[in-house]
From Swiss-Prot:
Keywords: Hydrolase, mRNA processing, Nucleus, Protein phosphatase. The gene is SSU72. Component of the cleavage and polyadenylation factor (CPF) complex, which plays a key role in polyadenylation-dependent pre-mRNA 3'-end formation and cooperates with cleavage factors including the CFIA complex and NAB4/CFIB. SSU72 is required for 3'-end formation of snoRNAs. This is RNA polymerase II subunit A C-terminal domain phosphatase SSU72. It comes from Candida glabrata (strain ATCC 2001 / BCRC 20586 / JCM 3761 / NBRC 0622 / NRRL Y-65 / CBS 138). GO terms for molecular function: protein tyrosine phosphatase activity; RNA polymerase II CTD heptapeptide repeat S5 phosphatase activity.
Length: 204
């Protein structure tokens, strides 16, 4: 089996719309198996006024959100990039998914801000580690706008490639990958000082 297909990646942000979905797209196009989630209580997107965001339950299809924003103001939401974002999202999967309701297991989870990292780690701890399967949770602090989502997504792909290469190397040499991950993260962080990184091993 292709090593890229053997590893299972996951990307997580608050609403499963911008940062996690751009990273989802980039990893998927690179040939990786990837899923994505949000950790917020609901999907929140900018509204026509600052104090009135658009709020949707997780599971609301991206296409429905797209059409709702289109009916509110095509001009406004095209200008701020939301319609283009949702168009990308609906090509990747049906709807935003909530991390806490997910049942899949992953080898690596990339979160896009510290509160999402904390939510994922807390949820995994609450699940109790019954499978005794390690999962590497890595936070990369990405600002929540279109341009930074693209920069962060490319940086996550670079890290995924480094991790993939090392996992393959460790399997061939019969060495323990867990002994190598901090060195990989340190090397990656040196190349991306503008994207602060956190790491925590956890268990399913």
């Amino acid at each position: 089996m292709d090593q890229k297909q053997a590893l299972k990646f996951c990307t997580v942000c608050a609403s499963n719309n911008n940062r996690s979905m751009e990273s989802h797209r980039i990893l998927q196009e690179a040939g990786y198996e990837v899923s994505s989630y949000g950790t917020g209580s609901a999907v929140r997107l900018p509204g026509l006024s600052f104090d009135k965001p658009n709020v949707y339950p997780f599971g609301t299809p991206y296409n429905d959100i797209y059409n709702d924003l289109l009916s509110q103001s095509a001009e406004r939401y095209k200008a701020n990039g939301l319609l283009q974002m949702l168009d990308r999202n609906r090509r990747l999967k049906k709807a935003p998914e909530k991390w806490q309701e997910g049942t899949k297991t992953f080898d690596f989870v990339f979160t896009c801000e510290e509160r999402c990292f904390d939510a994922v780690c807390e949820d995994l701890m609450n699940r109790g580690g019954r499978l005794n399967k390690i999962v590497h949770v890595i936070n990369i602090d990405i600002r929540d706008d279109n341009e930074n989502a693209k920069i962060g997504g490319r940086a996550i792909l670079e890290l995924a490639n480094m991790l993939n290469e090392k996992v393959s190397e460790c399997e061939q040499n019969d060495t323990l990958f867990e002994d190598c991950i901090l060195d990989i993260l340190t090397k990656w962080q040196e190349a991306h000082p503008q994207l602060p990184c956190l790491y925590a091993p956890s268990y399913y």
